[in-house]
Amino acid sequence: MKERRKYNRAGIQLHVRLEAVNAGRRIMVLDLTTRDISYTGTFIPTLTSFPEGTRFRMDFTLPGDNLEEFRDIESMMDCKGRLVRSDSHGIAIQFDEDCRFEGLKAL
């Protein structure tokens, strides 16, 4: 199967507070850890399933050490996105365009 991703993923585990919203109503808040992240999205392992169309607000906790790819911290603290895939391993979230981090483009 041909890889469809335009941008590489980095296997970086970041703490994320995930607020799930459906039809404008908050349905759940979870504290989770990413499995990987790219310029356009992230995969988050979870046993919780979400309905199609679920939107997310994400607050990432960034490590204090020198991760150069996260120098654009301001935009990362209040990121929004949408569910693009959900399976028994977790959820894939695509970031809204205003949440994309230039530092991750080069991975």
Predicted features and spans:
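N-terminal helix initiation/capping motif
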Residues: 1-37, 46-49, 107
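A generic structural micro-feature
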Residues: 6-10, 26, 72-75, 83-85
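Generic short beta-strand segments
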Residues: 17-19, 59-65
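C-terminal output/interaction extensions
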Residues: 23, 79-82, 88-107
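A structural micro-motif recognizing beta-strand termini
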Residues: 44-49, 96-98
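Short, Lys/Arg- and Gly-enriched loop/turn segments at beta-strand edges
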Residues: 63-74
